[in-house]
Amino acid sequence: MSHTINADATILNHLPQNFQNALPSAVADQLANLEAGSKMWLLPPLVDLCARLREPGQQQHGTLESEGRAARANGFLHVVIPPDTNPILENGSLLKGLRERALEDGGIYLHILGALTAGLEGERPSNIAGLKKGGCIAVSNARRPFQNDLVLLRTLEYAATFGMKVFFYPDEPSLSGDGVAHEGYIASY
């Protein structure tokens, strides 16, 4: 079964006719550059599920405007960022402004994963109520470990009281240490 359709698209006022109401206005400037007869893909906006933006904290390397321009140029309108930025995304009151600036300056819809534990240290839960109020779509400890499984259990229970989704990597530092395992004969040796 094919997931592509080979068809012509009629562009009117810089927007495809059949999709005029479905496309966000942020892509209108991109569609203005289409040339008649060019072979291009017409896709819904793409989603980057783990983008590493440089703002907040490292604006000397990239701003929301420059990162947004790069994302839009490649078809990405929705960008999800993990909490392990500098500073860590654990303050709900700052998140709304960050999302608004990403849309205004960069033309992208920013979706934020807040910090699951305070400072991403894996010791105690962060203020998940404040993060939800600030507009986080979920919480995560990024790739940082939890102190132990009890901390993980408590943070999962706390996040559940607010209906927050949790993204985490299954790693128990007391078991894994610096080791790795592979499936197969060597792992069971």
Regions found by a protein language model. Name each.
Residues 45, 74-78, 97-109, 173-189:
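Active-site gating loops and adjacent loop-to-helix segments of metal-dependent hydrolytic enzymes
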Residues 60-68, 120-130:
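Short, acidic/polar
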Residues 91-93, 122-127, 151-153, 176-182:
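Short acidic, glycine/serine/threonine-rich loops at helix termini
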Residues 88-98, 145-158:
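Active-site-adjacent beta->alpha loops and helix N-cap segments on the catalytic face
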Residues 37-102:
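Metal-associated gating/positioning segment near the N- to mid-region
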Residues 1-37, 42:
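N-terminal metal-binding scaffold of metallo-dependent hydrolase/deaminase domains
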Residues 66-90, 106-118, 132-147, 163-171:
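Divalent metal-dependent hydrolysis catalytic cores, especially in the metallo-beta-lactamase
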Residues 136, 152-187:
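Functional cores that coordinate and move charged inorganic groups
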